Amino acid sequence: MKKYLLTLLSVILFASASAFSQTLDYEKLAPHPRLLLKKGDITAMKEFCDRSDNAKEVHNRIISTADGYLSAMPVTRKMTGRRLLSVSREALKRIFYLSYAYLTTDDVRYAARAEREMLAICEFEDWNPSHFLDVGEMTMALAIGYDWLYRYLPVHSRSIIGTAIYEKGLRASENDKQAWFFRSDNNWNQVCNAGMIYGALATMERAPEYCKALIAKCLESNPIAQECYEPDGGYPEGFGYWDYGTGFEVMLVAALQSALGTDAGIASQQSFLRSATYMTYMTTPSGKCYNYYDSGSGMSCISSKYWFARQLNDPSIVAVDEWLIKQGKVPGDRLLPIYMLFGSSLDLSKTHLPKSKTWVNHGVAPIFVYRSGWESADDTYFAIKGGKASSNHAHMDAGSFIYEKLGVRWAVDLGMHDYNRLELAGVDLWNRSQDSERWSIFRIGAESHNTLMFNGHLHNVSGMAEIVETFDTPRRRGAVINLTPTFEGDATEVIRTAELDKNDNLTIADHIVCGDKPAIVEWRIATNAEAQIVAPNTIMLTQDGKTLYLKFKGRVAAEAKIWPDHNYKDYEIVDNNLRRVGFVLQLKANQTADVEVTMSDERGKNISLPKINLGLKRK
């Protein structure tokens, strides 16, 4: 049924996008500047600075960064492995910041420096179409500069830049092998389609029929990526890739709105609109994010969320982001100017923090989140996920979780590993099959995650772990995840229940029915805390002057364990100050085991979970 509904949704989205692409009224094409900006926006951004300390902070950050570019040499075509992406991203940041600085200050030094940057990029032999993200971002960079500086640029420079956008940007998408993003369901679709639409809208007058056809193709392709937000707004590639993919999706739709007065149906996709809430709940009390999959843990204001707040007329969507700016967490990312653009239309004095303490996402990467509050670094945060390892950018982490309490993240996720480092070492990184070398990377495989392992075996990469129940009462909050498909071949049933009591003590309960062979089961978490086994069933963690106890309960043979440091390969990032702690269970063939591990700052605390009808949990 779920597969049928997603297929039906895809048909609807494709039909909608196709209809919109055929009815775009190019007679309404706005004059330059037409990308993102409408009449009055520049004045509104200046007024935003006058009434908002946060806006003034962001504006000053952009201007000071642009000042630094004035004396810098233009970027060069320097590859990093198989990518030019770092150069494309730097170019986008420079041109966007310099163009913003010119429009808001009228200082021609910024426009002249942006012109110099663009002309240097036009001299590149190509923008590396074999890795099309590089082309997508570079095309957007020059499109913004061409459009925002249109009245400043000499005709000769416009011609050079417009020709480069057409030849090295738009026409690169004609190569079907290189432009596979048209068929992609992930961030590549969003980033590359956005870049192509920017290039086409900016230079529409130069090749109108070509540009219209390319925009139509992009709008027919983009709904494939829109499916990823179903059904609740979560992003299957994690926090970092939401910021990337959705940031460019916002850029795409906002450009259509400003240039043509339409959103092409994108802004009516409800799960897409809900996705800003997902990012809010990925923010933890420590000021970090829940960094599952290929994501870092760093956290700052997310500029693209301000488009959602504007679109939904709900400033509270960015309440957490406004708080982050006050904490000094202003992002240095290349899309920062859209904070000023979208934020200027909001009354940010009317924001309020979220009221709900829990949030759940079903779909490709199911997640349950609990947060005890929103105003203190000592608030409790817990998040647990399902999913499968064969998803894009996924790790082998079904059943894994993070846990913050007393201002400490006790159970951590190591997040992403540098791609270039692995690729240069010859690692087959993007192969997600069962026997892929990808799973041997410590940060990506199961050994580093806060989940189970049976007999040291890999998880079943195609086994989808679903959230099958959630509960949210003052005395009991949590979720139940069916991990049976994850451990197919080693167990006939694995159900993980995560529950927090009224004092935010966490219990992870695992119901295991062993397969037809004996199993050694490792229950493990990764932590930065000091660890000590203080009793046969108890491990004490200490960090930043705080203490947490892990206490095991169950009628099975088990021992507490602190694992030795991992033996990293030469090309892996070494995770210093990391410990893996937990319990090792010995199960007989076909044995049923119910075990609990309680994580509490009270040594004697132990929770017994209510009896659950586990037979109802199978999918």
Q: Over which residues does each language-model region extend?
A:
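Bacterial Sec-dependent N-terminal signal peptides
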Residues: 1-23
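CBM-like, beta-strand-rich accessory domains located in the C-terminal region of large
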Residues: 21-22, 322-329, 422-619
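Aromatic-lined, polymer-binding surfaces characteristic
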Residues: 26, 33-50, 54-288, 295-296
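Terminal accessory carbohydrate-recognition/targeting modules of carbohydrate-active enzymes
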Residues: 27, 33, 372-435, 441-446
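Primarily extracytoplasmic ectodomains and periplasmic/lumenal surface modules that are beta-strand-rich
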Residues: 42-43, 53, 377, 408-410, ...
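Beta-sandwich/jelly-roll carbohydrate-recognition scaffolds of carbohydrate-active enzymes
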Residues: 54-57, 63-66, 71-77, 356-358, ...
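Histidine-centered active-site/metal-ligand motif
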Residues: 134, 188, 241, 392-398, ...
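Carbohydrate-active enzyme catalytic cores, enriched for enzymes
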Residues: 203, 244-410, 471-476, 480-482, ...
